[in-house]
UniProtKB/Swiss-Prot annotation:
This is Leucine-rich repeat receptor-like kinase protein CLV1a. The gene is CLV1A. Pfam families: LRR_1 (PF00560), LRR_8 (PF13855), LRRNT_2 (PF08263), PK_Tyr_Ser-Thr (PF07714). It comes from Glycine max (Soybean). InterPro entries: Kinase-like_dom_sf (IPR011009), Leu-rich_rpt (IPR001611), Leu-rich_rpt_typical-subtyp (IPR003591), LRR_dom_sf (IPR032675), LRR_N_plant-typ (IPR013210), Prot_kinase_dom (IPR000719), Ser-Thr/Tyr_kinase_cat_dom (IPR001245), Ser/Thr_kinase_AS (IPR008271). Belongs to the protein kinase superfamily. Ser/Thr protein kinase family.
Length: 981
């Protein structure tokens, strides 16, 4: 009897368990399906989470993609990264109370986190990084998650103070809060974490002093507090007590003062990044006690003194970046003996003397850059002993002697820059056969001899040998350089004819062979090289006529054959070359009359001077003008009649099309609002603001309205022209995919969009002070004082820097200009208008475009020539904006003869008898400015000229620009530098 009762009881318990398990299983499935419905959003692809479907099977949900269950069929893990999803996290997430791992990163989820997350008390791993979550981070919902070990909220839109509730999570090991908008100081309580091993707070808007109490985090191994924060004071000396720390990143966060010698006590530290701050003083020799150190970056500071000799103890060092400081003295010989050193970058310092000849003997060197110092002597021969050296950069020094054969035969090299030295002798032939090299720059040296007859290299894009003593003929083997874009052989002693094979290169855009002893005609192949953008053959002894077919060169912008012996007539087909802005045919033997009309209207008489038998329309006698006037008038009448007839037909067609589109529009006027954050407004409110009296701007892509919402807020509404989707969406997709996802205080925030089948309306935060262009060139012109101009430059640079260096993939704006830098109520700058933006997946790579985009006067030369765009194209455009801030004039239209602002500045420098930086600035500075610090203007001017260098790779990065602008010389604020006009 007793056994029967026991059996019955067990059976009852089993059925109860089965019922509970069944209910829990179906409950988890229901929760997952509700998650799918909410998180997909309207913009997700149809196949997103396609296998998340209802089933009567108890275990079906355990086989959903990204879902894992325990033995009781309860969901314990969800990983739906990279789907992508565009909705929000619903309250039903709290029903998955057995969840241990929730990873929803790399999506486009928006809104605030639901309070129901607090029910996930078993959660150990929470990753919501790379989304668009906004608002204050709800620290209270984390408190019940007592098992939490990993919390990653990187790259979202969270604002407010750093939550202090995290400190109570005793098992938390990994806390990643960077890439948000957290502000205020780092809480002192953050020193109370019990188990924390990883803490990253970089790329926020933090301020105040770095708490010295963080040194109490004895379990911490990685600490990142840097980029885009703006702390006060310096590095806490107490950090030296963090003996477990292996990685410390305090880069680019406004730190000042000296480097504390006490940091040397961090014996386990392998990475120390202090670059891009305002650190001063000498490099503490005590740092040599950090025997585990592998990467040391002190670049972009104001450090002085010499490299400590005790650094010879750093046997594990692989990276030594000391560039852009005020270091002096010689490079100690022990640097060449560091057994693991791979990267040595010392550029822009005051180092002198000879380099140690043992550099590279460790067989590890990859990157070597000592540009802009005062080094002399011979080039070390063993730099490429490793066979892995990629960059050899020694420009702007005093090196002499030859280029060692060992370097010339280094097949791993990608960049060779040795211009502006005193190098001499023949260039080893091997340097012209390196398979991976992309740049060879040897200009302004004393090299001699002939170029080798055999030249090859599939990667070489820039070959610059200008201003040397090269002789002999230009080798036809240059045709083997199939990737060559820039060929500069000017100011040498080359002779013979120009080999026609040169112009068979498919990517050639810039050719400068001026200032040699070349003879013979211009090769007929010249007019077949349709990629050409700039050609300078001046100051030679060329003869013959200009080959026929010039009009085929549709990208040619500069053509200079002055001071030669070229004859024949000026090609009439030049009139059709709309890209040609600079033409110089002066001092030749041209005959006849200069053609008129078309592109010839752009050129002045200077372009044709010094040709005795050539006359212009002003100097040639009028011939039978009256005889032609009658027939021409009749012809004109016929043309006018035809135009009127065609116009009438066009109006009828347009009217019919208009009525058809109007009928279609009525069917498509269902507006829908999509917000990238919580918006307290409705689509109808936005549409009601599309009135003539609300227009605040017009452009090629659409009209911008000011919208006053019922809640009292103002928004900017950009109504895009054209259809709502498709290939010609006038930047709608580009804006959504770029500014819709990114967040930075100096990038105009896209709040959301309103759309129907015919029209897209983009909603932005309203900028009451308009654009920088309006303040410089409009009715408000001249009211910006220098301090405000400088502030705007720094802030706009930070916005672009974020696009280039903190977005993944990086974003190229492609239309940087003063009209796209908007100013809020406090005159803080915001980069705007991403309708032309493009993603670029590798920094330093380029992307080919089908046509030129951007604004005339701001477009980088290589972009206009090759249609290839990279982040350095934006740098050029920003340099033009800096010149606008200094000069106060538009980039084009004010300098005559197709000259832009960059060309005008260079021309002004050449015209000055003593062209110092100060003289140039005083000659070009905005006359409306008064009381400005001259040194500050000169400083920005020099940065601007770095940005607008003709060759893209020689321009600084936006990160370097930000650092330079943020760290002006102290003397720029001294009152004795003020200029009153």
């Amino acid at each position: 009897m007793r056994s029967c009762v026991c059996y019955t009881l067990l059976l009852f318990v089993f059925f109860i368990w089965l019922h509970v398990a069944t209910c829990s299983s179906f409950s988890d499935m229901d929760a997952l399906l509700k998650l799918k419905e909410s998180m997909k959003g309207d913009r997700a692809k149809d196949d997103a989470l396609h296998d998340w479907k209802f089933s009567t099977s108890l275990s079906a949900h355990c086989f959903f993609s990204g879902v894992s269950c325990d033995q009781e069929l309860r969901v314990v893990a969800i990983n739906v990264s990279f789907v992508p999803l565009f909705g929000h996290v619903p309250p039903e997430i709290g029903e998955l109370d057995k969840l241990e791992n929730l990873t929803i990163s790399q999506n486009n989820l928006t809104g605030e986190l639901p309070k129901e997350l607090a029910a996930l008390t078993s959660l150990k791993h929470l990753n919501i990084s790379h989304n668009v979550f906004s608002g204050y981070f709800p620290g209270k919902i984390i408190l019940p998650m007592t098992e939490l070990e990993v919390l990653d909220v990187y790259d979202n839109n969270f604002t407010g103070s750093l939550p202090e509730e995290f400190v109570k999570l005793e098992k938390l090991k990994y806390l990643k809060l960077d890439g948000n908008y957290f502000s205020g100081s780092i809480p002192e309580s953050y020193s109370e974490f019990k188990s924390l091993e990883f803490l990253s707070l970089s790329t926020n808007s933090l301020s105040g002093n770095i708490p010295k109490s963080l040194s109490k985090l004895k379990t911490l191994r990685i600490l990142k507090l840097g980029y885009n924060n703006a702390y006060e004071g310096g590095i806490p000396p107490e950090f030296g007590t963090m003996e477990s720390l292996k990685y410390l990143d305090l880069s680019s966060c406004n730190l000042s003062g000296e480097i504390p010698p006490s940091l040397a006590n961090m014996r386990n530290l392998d990475t120390l990044f202090l670059q891009m701050n305002n650190l001063t003083g000498t490099i503490p020799s005590e740092l040599s006690d950090m025997v585990s150190l592998m990467s040391l970056d002190l670049s972009f500071n104001g450090l002085t003194g010499e490299i400590p000799t005790r650094f010879s103890q750093l046997k594990n060092l692989t990276l030594m970046n000391f560039f852009h400081n005020n270091l002096r003295g010689s490079v100690p010989s022990f640097v060449g003996e560091l057994p693991n050193l791979e990267t040595l970058q010392l550029w822009e310092n005051n180092f002198s003397s000879e380099l140690p000849q043992n550099l590279g003997q460790n067989g590890k060197f990859k990157f070597f850059d000592v540009t802009k110092n005062h080094f002399s002597g011979l080039i070390p021969r063993d730099l490429c002993k490793s066979g892995r050296l990629q960059t050899f950069l020694i420009t702007d020094n005093f090196f002499h002697g030859p280029i060692p054969n060992e370097i010339a035969n280094c097949k791993s090299l990608t960049k060779i820059r040795a211009s502006n030295n005193y190098l001499n002798g023949a260039v080893p032939s091997g340097i012209f056969k390196l398979p991976s090299v992309t740049i060879i720059e040897l200009a302004n040296n004393r090299f001699n001899g002939e170029l080798p007859p055999e030249i090859s290299g599939d990667s070489l894009g820039i070959l610059t040998l200008s201003n040397n003593l090269f002789t002999g003929k230009i080798p036809p083997a240059l045709k083997n350089l199939r990737a060559l874009q820039t060929l500069s052989l000017d100011t040498n002693e080359f002779l013979g004819e120009i080999p026609g094979e040169v112009f068979d290169l498919p990517m050639l855009t810039v050719v400068n062979i001026s200032g040699n002893n070349l003879t013979g005609p211009i090769p007929t192949t010249f007019t077949r090289c349709v990629s050409l953008a700039a050609v300078d053959l001046s100051r030679n002894m060329l003869d013959g006529e200009i080959p026929k077919g010039m009009k085929n060169l549709t990208d040619l912008s500069i053509f200079n054959v002055s001071i030669n012996q070229i004859s024949g007539s000026v090609p009439d087909e030049i009139r059709f070359m709309l890209s040609l802005t600079t033409l110089d045919l002066s001092y030749n033997n041209f005959i006849g009359k200069v053609p008129t009309g078309g592109q010839f209207l752009v050129f002045s008489d200077k372009s044709f001077a010094g040709n005795p038998n050539l006359c212009s329309s002003h100097s040639c006698p009028n011939s039978s003008l009256k005889k032609r006037r009658g027939p021409w008038s009749l012809k004109s009448t016929r043309v006018i009649v035809m135009v009127i007839a065609l116009a009438t037909a066009a109006i009828l067609v347009a009217g019919t099309e208009y009525m058809r589109r109007r009928r279609k529009l009525k069917l498509a006027m269902t507006w829908k609002l999509t917000g990238f954050q919580r918006l307290n407004l409705k689509a109808e409110e936005v549409v009601e603001c599309l009135k003539e009296e609300n227009i605040i701007g017009k452009g090629g892509a659409g009209i911008v309205y000011r919208g006053s919402m019922r809640n009292g807020s103002d928004v900017a509404i950009k109504r895009l022209v054209g259809a709502g989707s498709g290939r010609n969406d006038y930047g709608f997709k580009a804006e959504i995919e770029t500014v819709g996802k990114i967040r930075h205080r100096n990038i105009m925030r896209l709040l959301g969009y309103v759309s129907n089948k015919e029209t897209n309306l983009l909603l932005y935060e309203y900028m009451p002070n308009g654009s920088l262009g309006e303040w410089l060139h409009g009715a408000k012109g001249g009211h910006l004082k220098w301090e405000m101009r400088y502030k705007i430059a720094v802030e706009a640079a930070k916005g672009l820097c974020y696009l280039h260096h903190d977005c993944s993939p990086l974003i190229i704006h492609r239309d940087v200009k003063s009209n796209n830098i908007l100013l809020d109520a406090h005159f803080e700058a915001h980069v705007a208008d991403f309708g032309l933006a493009k993603f670029l997946y590798d920094l330093g790579s380029s992307q080919s475009m089908s046509s030129i985009a951007g604004s005339y006067g701001y477009i980088a030369p290589e972009y206009a020539y090759t249609l290839k765009v990279d982040e350095k194209s934006d740098v050029y455009s920003f340099g033009v904006v800096l010149l606008e801030l200094i000069i106060g004039r538009k980039p084009v239209g004010e300098f005559g003869d197709g000259v832009d602002i960059v060309g005008w500045v260079n021309k002004t420098r050449l015209e000055l008898s003593q062209p110092s930086d100060a003289a140039v600035v005083l000659a070009v500075v905005d006359p409306r400015l008064s009381g400005y610090p001259l040194i500050s203007v000169i400083y920005m001017f020099n940065i601007a000229m770095m940005c607008v260098k003709e060759v893209g790779p020689t321009r600084p990065t936006m990160r370097e620009v930000v650092h330079m602008l943020s760290n002006p010389p102290h003397s720029t604020t001294h009152t004795h530098n003020l200029i009153n006009l």
